[in-house]
Design a protein with these regions (language model features):
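Electrostatic, structured charged patches in enzyme active sites and in nucleic-acid/phosphate-binding
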Residues: 1-226
Length: 226
């Protein structure tokens, strides 16, 4: 008989797309950048999404579970299928990011890919290594604590409130969240906290007291450099 965990895994896969890697932890997270839920198939995907995609101002959009074929040096095989991440930069440039079990630094180069329609073209390929993900784990853990505050803002637009908070940030330049709450005319402080969390994800501001385990009124921040 299937366990409750396996049933939940099956429902998640059915609702958000079947992934080939289903033996690791599955994560269902809300993406501010895409304004939609994401199905992430491992802890490594979670780390990379938080630290290098969601919070990266140079990344416009991304797609996990992107099946594509990469050209290899083996003449017998020619192209090898991989499950990767399609990344679109704010410049419009496309890259293929591939989380691997390799060690060492991230390797980036132009590779030849065969697309689903059979066309072949060169795209920048980045091999994301285990060693690199280890260096990003603490940062992603801090961002993970912001997700509940960001998720409460989902599917809603707060243009006037965001403008008020942003103007306040520009005036204060640095401080704690309590000071932002006290300096704005937004009545609901949870909306202010949610907007601040969203701005951290978007790279507008950065959290400066990195040793703190919680996110709240006493969290310190500063404006990011343009």
């Amino acid at each position: 008989m299937p366990s409750l965990k396996s049933k939940m895994r099956g429902r998640l896969a059915a609702a958000h797309g079947q992934r080939t890697n289903t033996t690791n932890n599955l994560w269902l997270c809300y993406s501010v950048k895409l304004n939609q839920d994401l199905s992430l198939a491992s802890n490594n995907e979670l780390i990379y999404w938080l630290a290098d995609l969601e919070s990266n101002r140079n990344v416009k959009s991304f797609r996990f579970g992107y099946n594509i074929q990469i050209q290899v040096n083996d003449p017998k095989e020619n192209f090898k299928p991989i499950e990767a991440i399609q990344v679109i930069l704010d410049t419009g440039h496309e890259e293929i990011h591939h989380i691997t079990s390799k060690t060492g630094n991230v390797d980036a180069f132009s590779a030849t890919f065969c697309l689903k329609d059979g066309s072949v073209r060169n795209i920048t390929y980045r091999a994301i290594t285990e060693d690199y993900l280890v260096t990003r784990a603490k940062y992603s853990a801090r961002l993970l604590r912001l997700l509940p505050f960001v998720a409460q803002m989902r599917y809603k637009k707060w243009p006037s409130e965001e403008e008020i908070v942003l103007n306040t940030l520009k005036i204060l330049k640095t401080g704690d969240i309590q000071e932002i709450i006290a300096s704005t005319s937004v009545g609901d402080e949870m909306i202010v906290v949610g907007i601040v969390a969203k701005f951290i994800f978007q790279g507008v501001i950065k959290q400066t007291n990195l040793s703190m385990s919680d996110f709240g009124r006493s969290t310190w921040w500063s404006l990011s450099e343009s």
